[in-house]
């Protein structure tokens, strides 16, 4: 990886630090495989994440980006309060200008290195093999294309997400928390919440959003700088974001999703 920020050896060291954090994380298996780990990114990287955060006009809303479909395109929809830059799409990454672009281009290449991607999948290998009916972990790469997607997110004011299992094309999701209002810890949970359906055994294959009233919240991740919350996508991986009622709140984070698609071997 060629860059003007860090030497090759430093970059490889950053990869190893992240892999160490992920592989040694303690997975909780109920109600679906997930974990939370502190201080995920190397110190040198998280400092630059904050220093080189893109300007507001370089983000676009979920509705404008096309990330949300089958909804009325109105500003009252919750997706209007989530702004994003898809770092793995050249056109969106190019919205970032100057020195900021240099860093985020480096950051994207760092987090999508083959070793990092394999570690992100390996931690959930048993669940992935069970879901896809694979005999061993290597079969995943033999039979499927693996596609990482990194979305830099800025949630504002009234943003919330109802319980959902997520896009069925995803294998795993990693949420890296960067920054929020200084006193957010005094209010409602800011991190992603885990839910169990009131209706015993209820599952959802499509990943549509459901009402909070139909679920019990059993856990909320701590929204703290450099915390990572991750889960393996299943038909009961219900998660969401609680709406903060007391005052306007902002959150800055990265959503790292790994998608899969069957290889065409013809």
Regions found by a protein language model. Name each.
Residues 2, 66-69, 242, 256:
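Residue-level marker of intrinsically disordered, low-complexity segments enriched
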């Amino acid at each position: 990886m060629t860059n003007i920020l860090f030497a090759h050896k430093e970059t490889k060291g950053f990869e190893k630090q992240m892999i160490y954090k992920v592989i040694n994380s303690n997975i909780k298996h109920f109600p679906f495989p997930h974990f939370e780990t502190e201080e995920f990114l190397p110190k040198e990287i998280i400092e630059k994440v904050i220093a080189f955060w893109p300007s507001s006009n370089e983000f676009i809303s979920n509705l404008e980006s096309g990330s949300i479909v089958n909804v009325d395109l109105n500003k009252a929809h919750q997706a209007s309060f989530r702004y994003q830059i898809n770092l793995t799409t050249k056109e969106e990454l190019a919205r970032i200008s100057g020195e900021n672009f240099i860093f985020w281009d480096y950051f994207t290449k760092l987090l999508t290195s083959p070793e990092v991607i394999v570690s992100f999948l390996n931690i959930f290998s048993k669940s992935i093999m069970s879901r896809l009916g694979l005999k061993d972990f290597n079969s995943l790469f033999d039979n499927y294309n693996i596609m990482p997607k990194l979305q830099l997110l800025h949630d504002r004011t009234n943003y919330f997400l109802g319980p959902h299992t997520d896009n069925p094309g995803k294998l795993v999701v990693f949420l890296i928390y960067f920054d929020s209002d200084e006193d957010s810890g005094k209010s409602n949970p800011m991190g992603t919440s885990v839910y169990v359906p009131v209706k015993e055994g209820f599952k959802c294959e499509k990943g549509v959003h459901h009402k909070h009233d139909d679920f019990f919240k059993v856990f909320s991740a701590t929204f703290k700088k450099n915390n990572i919350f991750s889960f393996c996508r299943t038909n009961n991986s219900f998660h969401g974001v609680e709406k903060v009622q007391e005052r306007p709140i902002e959150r800055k984070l990265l959503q790292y999703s790994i998608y899969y698609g069957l290889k065409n071997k013809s």
